[in-house]
Amino acid sequence: MKSNRGSNSRFKLLAFIVAFAVSLLASMAAAGPASAGQSHHRTWQVQVGSESRDQAIQGMQFLPSEIFINEHDTITWEANSAEIHTVTFLASGQPLEEFNPFSDDELLKRGGDSYDGHSYYNSGLLANVDVPGFPDARSYSLAFPREGDFTYYCLVHGMVMKGTVHVREQGTDYPYSQADYDKSSRAEARSILRDGRELTRDLADQATSHMVIAGGDDGVAMVMRFIRPTVTVHVGEKVNFVNTGMGAPHTVTFGNEPANIFAPSGDPWHFSGGDLNSGIIPPQGTFEVTFKATGTFEYICALHDYMGMVGKVKVVD
């Protein structure tokens, strides 16, 4: 499933970064630099993710994604979406790998409250709602006692969701205030929502009665919905569930959720009702089901049903 959106996703990310920088420069020109003082240590706020009111669109950005602070300042990252994220500083030389939902080192907080500049620090999972089956927190704070430029990632979404903390010498004037960052972040969040709505329309053009789009993302926004959530097919016909995204996994789960939602279970080739689970459908992955009996069969994404990612297949003679 290739589209023009996939080919220009890097351009879109660059456009968001440029727009954010321009907005910050405009704020700085209007307000001037903020004085640091000599002994006062500040606490800064960064939003983790963003979302539409109905949670159908989820943002894949730290807002702001780049922040300038001074030695001994603290940053508090606030969960701003129902989708899970992490704030993770990798250890020196540690590669960024695929998210492992079975690793406590990725699910839970690791490291202390003051960053040493080279060890592994992790917020654990952050979300602004309770996420079924996962431990989660609402915020994460970390102090920065040393100068340097430090990159961090969301382990769940990988390279498409990263941020940078620039720590300067104590007493350096701040180029931007918290109000500057907040203003630019609000503008970027609105842009992410516009991108998500456009992505939803593009996915709707791809969906058919026999091909349901099981979510999608483009490196900027995620669509947490089945596109064509209700389809009608005949007995013996197939429905193909396609994850068109770049970074977000999904499931297609009929009946009761299994204890391990990440593993496939049931018989998708002869489905007449009952329990059936795709296991994880990775980005660009598919899951095909052949329906052998009439009826209305409801299903969910076991990872995102609490956001409203549900659907049904009506099977007729």
What are these regions (language model features)?
Residues M1-K12:
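N-terminal secretory signal peptides that target proteins for export/translocation
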Residues A15-S27:
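Bacterial N-terminal signal peptides
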Residues A31-D317:
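Extracytoplasmic copper-binding redox domains, predominantly the cupredoxin/blue-copper superfamily
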